[in-house]
UniProtKB/Swiss-Prot annotation:
Pathway: Amino-acid biosynthesis; L-histidine biosynthesis; L-histidine from 5-phospho-alpha-D-ribose 1-diphosphate: step 6/9. Gene3D superfamilies: Imidazole glycerol phosphate dehydratase, domain 1. This is Imidazoleglycerol-phosphate dehydratase. One of its GO terms (molecular function) is imidazoleglycerol-phosphate dehydratase activity. It is an enzyme of class 4 (lyase). Belongs to the imidazoleglycerol-phosphate dehydratase family. Transmembrane segments: none annotated.
Length: 197
């Protein structure tokens, strides 16, 4: 079973995360940050990864620690659930339209963490959510999951649509990249014989 649970506690946050890579996209998410919860629900739904997140943080300061630390824990859980990454497709991409916005995401489940994020927001906030935290989440998630991810918004106006298209594009690419390919016959998809990084 490709599943994992991670608990993380610091002076700033306390987070419990569970993932099941072979799920149906079910999400149980509570971070205290409404828009972020909505984005994590989209990530689960469109990746078909079952995701459970319970996070409490120093929201009296701001949302940064809660969002970033959730990315760290979620990335660690994904990495653990992937194991040695044997048999997976490894590479995938998705082009995701959301009304006037178009975003693409490409992923390599390589064990080598790297993020390219080419997305600009015309507004600093979506409701009470700082738009700069979109990148902060992806950075934390990618680095701890051991993924190479490129996300680029080709065009868009509405900040909500731009953020949501980024999460959905990553979700769709992730869904394809972690899928077990029966033709691999359990082999690790690398001529090195390892995707440990």
């Amino acid at each position: 079973m490709r599943a994992a649970t991670i608990s993380r506690k610091t002076k700033e946050t306390e987070i419990a995360v569970s993932v099941d890579l072979d799920g149906t996209g079910a999400a149980t998410v509570s971070t205290g940050v409404g828009f972020f919860d909505h984005m994590l629900e989209q990530l689960a739904r469109h990746s078909l990864i079952d995701i459970s997140v319970a996070a409490t943080g120093d929201l009296h300061i701001d949302q940064h620690h809660t969002v970033e630390d959730t990315g760290i824990a979620l990335g660690q859980a994904l990495r653990q659930a992937l194991g040695d990454r044997a048999g997976i497709a490894r590479y995938a991409n998705a082009l995701l339209p959301m009304d006037e916005t178009l975003t693409r995401a490409a992923i390599d489940v390589s064990g080598r963490p790297f993020l390219v994020f080419k997305t600009e927001f015309r507004r600093a906030k979506i409701g009470e959510f700082d738009t700069e935290l979109v990148r902060e989440f992806f950075q934390a998630f990618v680095m701890n999951a051991g993924l190479t991810v490129h996300i680029e918004t080709l065009y868009g106006e509405n900040a909500h649509h731009i953020a949501e298209s980024c999460f959905k594009a990553l979700a769709r690419a992730l869904r394809l990249a972690i899928e077990v390919d029966p033709r691999q016959k359990g082999a690790i998809p690398s001529t090195k014989g390892s995707l440990a990084g």
